Amino acid sequence: ICCRICAMGPCRITPKAPRGICGCDAHGIVGRNYLKFTAGGAATHSDHGREICHTLYASAPDGAYKVKDPEKLIRIAKEWGVETEGKDIYDLAHEVAELALLEYGKPFGFQRWVQRAPKHTQEIWEREGITPRAIDREVSCSLHMSHMGCSSKPEALVRQSFRAGLGDGWGGSMCGTEFSDVLFGTPKPIDTEANLGVMVAENVNIVVHGHDPSLSEMICEYADDPEMIAYAKSVGAKGITISGVCCTSNEVAMRRGIPMA
């Protein structure tokens, strides 16, 4: 077990040296490291959700990104107490997107989405003091607690890792999931393929990957454009084949039937 978070280290814990230079033992070091990992994951997935919220805010009837599931948008708006009657769907999209973006840095209160959890689960979170607050606050708090000279109690560090994880799962990641459906359509059962054999030797092969479906959706959209297909043929290909790997592969597979490489 090794701690590398300050310039006086690294400190390696051994039977002869059970504590680091700051006095932290193996349990505290593992707790710090685990919390840092959790903060990194929460920041990554939540930032994906933030990008989707910004994309929803930029949606327009004549723009590249449109609202493809207005019914789901209206359901979410009502869930959040937003008036929907008589509103243009894009005005509503922008209002809901702004509220979602405020979930990342609001100074008071807890995440809106946690109200979806079963009541008894919410009571457990409240009792244990891990109901997630603003998404970015949980990440910031995690990095604060796991920095040199700060928390060394493993119980407190692991407790905050729970809170940061919930802030992601019931905050940033849920924003990404729900508003991706609003923008790109809610998935339905669909047939597709999975294998490296989905690539076509005579075609231009484009493999989409990553977390955020905003770019991959546009790639899929324009791969079917006659102008793009003509361009591919002008350089000797027979067409364009899109396939996917990683999380984005699932996004385009379940909405468009794009095969997984």
Language model features with spans:
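Metallocofactor- and cofactor-centric catalytic cores in central/energy metabolism, strongly enriched
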Residues: 1-261
